[in-house]
Regions:
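Short hydrophobic beta-strand element within catalytic cores of glycosyltransferases
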Residues: 36-37, 283-286, 296
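Conserved acidic donor-binding segment of nucleotide-sugar-dependent glycosyltransferases
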Residues: 297-299, 303-310, 319-325
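Aromatic "clamp/platform" in nucleotide-sugar-dependent glycosyltransferases that forms part
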Residues: 266
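Short alpha-helical donor nucleotide-sugar binding micro-motif in glycosyltransferases
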Residues: 75, 245-246, 253-258
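Glycosyltransferase donor-sugar binding loop
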Residues: 36-42, 162, 194-197, 215-228, ...
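Nucleotide-activated donor-binding/catalytic signature segment of Leloir-type glycosyltransferases, i.e.
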Residues: 228-246
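A conserved mid-protein helix/loop that constitutes part of the nucleotide-sugar donor-binding site
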Residues: 13-21, 189, 193-209, 303, ...
């Protein structure tokens, strides 16, 4: 297959890494893969040393004519037969390119986050009429797309995957340096939270009910003034560390420090951070929202709580502090979930089968 993947929004986020795994994986399986994205993006940097062919397209705004024309040229020059758009502005450009130039392609949009709003008037109709299918990375994302008017039969669920090989390069020396930086002792309880724009304050509120002193390690954000007011109410001398924004290789070296990983998110599609924690054997607690409840079976390979319910979050944290056997059980079952049930190979198998099916239906017309 000749496949063009487009993405205008490619900053430090799990979704960017998911696009990288898809593009590289399809290229390694022998498909010709082009990725159209702005040059100053993380996506460009991550793919620059790979068999994927990169093309600079700005997708500066939704009706950006030069981007529409570039998509047309790419399709015609390379005889592209599958176009897979990943973010909002390139979704518009790809639909317009196909309509205006009557391009003989199959066009698929991928949704990686819960769809929160209808957007522009008629946008859901525009997306459905303009594409052959929409891929949702979880059933939760599919439901949110249905809620804004996309018909069920137009949406295909293909879960994100995580590549086992990325966990084989964790350097124990780097982990020890981080342990020293944060002054973590061997028996300390460390609650990790790897996320950018989530409801991290829920975790801080939950700690007002935890008497046992813990470390909290936020990876992905800086300290914020609103956090300080909550910390002042803590009954125990919990220690909070903010690692700020770090690249994925460095993020991975933080997980071995964690006793547990908490993800207090509100719009999760299918979290790479949860997959990473589970793959590395870290017990997980997450909001029962989006794809979180498809990754985590409550009480089997992790724990779930309702968004905003700091009391239940606190009791889950206390339970994992107290019960080492449960932690070991979640570690084992979580690892199996991430590396077997949500493997990269499974994800790529599903994309290949779906793209092939779409191309075959095209040939029947």
């Amino acid at each position: 297959m000749n496949i063009l993947i487009t993405s205008q929004k490619a900053e430090i986020a799990g979704s960017t890494y998911s696009v990288v795994y898809l593009a590289k994986g399809l290229a390694h399986r022998g498909h010709n893969v082009w990725v159209a994205t702005p040059t100053d993006t993380l996506l460009w940097r991550l793919l620059s040393d790979s068999p994927v062919q990169l093309v600079e397209v700005s997708f500066a705004f939704k009706f950006h004519l030069p981007s529409v024309q570039k998509v047309k040229k790419l399709v015609q020059l390379h005889q592209i037969n599958i176009v897979n758009a990943q973010s909002s502005k390139d979704r518009y450009s790809t639909i317009l390119a196909r309509w205006w130039y009557k391009l003989p392609i199959k066009l698929i949009h991928t949704r990686r986050q819960l769809v929160k709003s209808l957007g522009l008037f008629g946008q859901s109709t525009f997306y459905e009429q303009g594409t052959d299918a929409i891929v949702a990375v979880s059933k939760g994302v599919k439901q949110s797309a249905k809620n804004i008017g996309i018909s069920e039969e137009h949406i295909k669920v293909i879960y994100n995957g995580t590549p086992a090989e990325k966990y084989q390069h964790i350097d124990p020396n780097k982990v020890n340096l981080l342990r020293q930086r944060y002054q973590i002792k061997d028996n300390d309880i460390v609650i990790g939270c790897v996320a950018r724009h989530k409801e991290q304050i829920q975790l801080l509120r939950a700690l007002t009910e935890i008497q046992h002193p813990v470390h909290v390690l936020f990876v992905g954000i800086e300290e914020r003034p609103k956090f300080r007011a909550v910390q002042n109410r803590w009954p125990a001398p919990h220690r909070v560390h903010f690692a700020g924004s770090v690249d994925n290789r460095e993020v991975l070296h933080h997980y071995p420090l964690f006793t547990m990983n908490v993800l207090p998110s509100t719009i999760e599609g299918l979290s790479q951070a949860l997959l990473e924690a589970m793959a590395l054997g870290v017990p997980v607690i997450a909001t029962e929202i989006g794809g979180n409840s498809e990754l985590i079976q409550d009480g089997v390979n992790g724990l779930l709580f309702q968004n905003g319910d700091a009391n239940t979050l606190a009791s889950h944290i206390q339970r994992l502090i107290d019960d080492e056997d449960l932690r070991e059980n979640f570690s084992r079952t979580g690892k199996k979930t991430a590396l077997e049930d949500f493997s990269i190979d499974k994800m790529l198998d599903h994309y290949e089968a779906f793209f092939t099916e779409l191309l075959e239906t095209k040939q029947h017309h």
